[in-house]
From Swiss-Prot:
This is Kynurenine 3-monooxygenase. Its EC number is 1.14.13.9. Pathway: Cofactor biosynthesis; NAD(+) biosynthesis; quinolinate from L-kynurenine: step 1/3. It catalyses: L-kynurenine + NADPH + O2 + H(+) = 3-hydroxy-L-kynurenine + NADP(+) + H2O. Keywords: FAD, Flavoprotein, Monooxygenase, NADP, Oxidoreductase, Pyridine nucleotide biosynthesis. It comes from the Bacteria.
Amino acid sequence: MSAAASPRSLTLIGAGLAGCLLAILLSRRGWQITLYERRGDPRIKGYESGRSINLALAERGRHALRQACAEDAVMAKAVMMRGRMIHPVSGEPQLQRYGRDDSEVIWSIHRAALNVTLLDLAEQAGARVHFYRRLHTVDFDAGYARFIDDRDDQPHEIHFQALVGSDGAGSALRAAMQRKAPVGEHIAFLDHSYKELEIPPRADGGFRIERNALHIWPRGRYMCIALPNDGGTFTVTLFLPNEGMPSFATTRSGDEALALFARDFPDALPLIPQLKEHWEEHPPGLLGTLTRERWHLDGRAVLLGDAAHAMVPFHGQGMNCAFEDCVALAEQLDAHSDLSEAFAAFEAARRDDAAAIQQMALENYLEMRDRVGDAQFLLQRALEQQLQARWPTRFVPHYTMVTFLRTRYAIALARSEIQREILLEATHGHTDLSRIDWVALETVVHARLEPLEGAH
């Protein structure tokens, strides 16, 4: 379709987090936005997402929400997390702060609460939302799309100018684009899966464990995490290998899950009274990384968020990255009247950064499950904090760049690799920081790391 036919009209597939945020951003710019969602209205029917892992909202995501005038409404439902609360098999939990103080924190928010908030704001901005519309087929040449209402199998056909795929990792639009022209899709599944559980609130409605932290029970090849909700509950997620001992293959029944928690997560077990029932009710979820050689089909379709570059959840950046995508696409639509140019420029602007955070998310899993209790890791963390205190604009911790700043992911990855080398070399053979050669370190830091924009 020619961009001149209806230059300010887009059809969005998927009314999840990214779809709703993009709808707000573009509706506020004067675009006519229509969203089609395969599920029912969550405000009426209740939330039906295939996954409910809590989301970690960082500065990137908050910046995108500010662009849409949505930050205040979202933050009212978020819970602050100061750091990781590490739970050993025995002994007291220890807090590892994310940043220097409470200005450097992340926020936990329940996916359903966030989706409903953004959905309300999208409609208020003027977007139209159609529920029970599962994308079935697309005729890209004629500009027609057919949807099916799964309640009665009735078809619904529409005419479109261009489609935006914000329909997640299992994107139906991506599949339709693949049928039209191969897009070089590759999915690498992790050899681990996850299962969701819940810590209920106390009888008085309060939190059973520290509310302002992301709780981690690291156990080497596997781990359990818990993120707070604003209603006093915690969403618990167990990440476990698919095979081996222990694994989902060896922990099938609720009784086997009880035995696993009694042995490896003894302080978590009494917090999850419905462990057995939830274990048997909730199937394991898959974890994977999606890459594609092309995110758009000239000016007729484009993908963003998980539909373009799904990642494992271990850096808490999937949503934040998708929200950055929304802002980037809106900016390219501002800059280019031709949709094919806008979509191509969007992909060019975001491809390297998406690949970088996908890599960092995989690396963070190893850190969370294997290293957070390791003495050498803790020594490197201590040195990292000292280097940041001495040269705050040059030595900026990895987590700070990714989470508290909006440093491009690709730049954060490149700098993090240099900083990791510096930390490894400086701590080699040491058990504490008393014999660190600070003069030599200053020379290395200034030689290898330029000042970073935004660091302070």
